[in-house]
Swiss-Prot record:
Domain of life: Eukaryota
One cellular-component annotation, GO: mitochondrial intermembrane space
Chain positions of Sel1-like repeats: 34-66, 68-104, 108-145, 146-182, 183-218
Biological role stated in the UniProt entry: May be required for assembly of mitochondrial respiratory chain complexes.
One Pfam family in the UniProt entry: Sel1
Cellular compartment(s): Mitochondrion intermembrane space
Coiled-coil regions listed in the entry: none
Keyword annotations: Mitochondrion, Repeat
Main location: mitochondrion
Family: Belongs to the hcp beta-lactamase family.
Organism: Xenopus tropicalis (Western clawed frog)
Database matches in InterPro entries: HcpB-like, Sel1-like, TPR-like_helical_dom_sf
Protein name (Swiss-Prot/TrEMBL): Cytochrome c oxidase assembly factor 7
Lineage of source species: Eukaryota, Metazoa, Chordata, Craniata, Vertebrata
Length: 231
């Protein structure tokens, strides 16, 4: 069919990819399109493997345009020192914060990362900020990010500066994490129901949640084995 690239034709594929790069460069550098700049950064990273150039485009697109996906990716670069950037958790935090507040495909992931970095304390002179962590975990959990829901349950299970221990909230977020496929959310909720730990004891719910945790663990092991076999 006309217009389709013959993937078996190496020259045709190369020409197609080169044309993509030209198109994205024009969108970004000439037309100043934020989405075009994000596409150019992805092209440089995934096709050209030019991480240094990708980092520079991401930086421009995040700093000047506050493009949510570019800010998320730039934050990830700062976390690992990719693309010639320094490892800089404070810079990463700023990028994730922009992405979280802006909204977009990666905003929920970014909100979770803001929560993690606030909880960890390394972006605040080794002073964990449990209140800020809770607020951003809440945003991510509202977007059905399972790990944020689980981290909220852990905060309420133990209590933290400014956040009193609350077993009902701990159970609520454990069960939500479980419903989103988080094995340890299921395990913690099961334990709370089994022991009656701050909530009404319920052996039936405890058993059901324990079985779900086992199922999730088995599925996780199967996925790991499949990845290993596929290497």
């Amino acid at each position: 069919m006309a217009g389709l690239v013959d993937l078996k034709n190496e020259e045709e594929v190369k020409e197609y990819l080169d044309n993509l790069g030209t198109e994205y460069s024009y969108q970004c550098l000439k037309e100043k399109q934020p989405d075009g700049c994000n596409r150019l950064a992805e092209y440089l990273e995934n096709i050209k493997k030019n991480f240094e150039s990708a980092a520079q485009i991401l930086k421009i697109n995040c700093d000047q345009n506050e493009h949510s996906e570019s800010c998320y990716k730039l934050g990830a670069y700062y976390v690992t020192g990719k693309g010639g950037l320094p490892v800089d958790l404070k810079a990463a935090y700023g990028c994730f914060l922009k992405s979280c507040n802006k909204g977009g495909k990666k905003s929920i992931d970014s909100c979770h990362n803001v929560g993690l970095l606030s909880h960890d304390g390394r972006v605040n002179d080794d002073k964990p900020d449990a209140l800020k962590a809770r607020d951003y975990y809440n945003k991510a959990c509202d977007g059905n990010f399972a790990a944020s829901c689980f981290n909220l349950s852990a905060i309420y299970l133990q209590g933290a500066p400014g956040i009193p221990k609350d077993m009902n909230m701990a159970l609520h977020f454990s069960e939500k994490a479980c419903s989103l496929g988080h094995m340890w959310g299921c395990a913690n909720a099961s334990r709370m129901y089994k022991l009656g730990d701050g909530v009404a004891k319920n052996d039936e719910k405890a058993e059901s949640l324990k079985n779900k945790a086992r199922d999730l663990h088995r599925m996780q092991q199967e996925r790991t084995q499949q990845i290993s076999f596929g290497e």
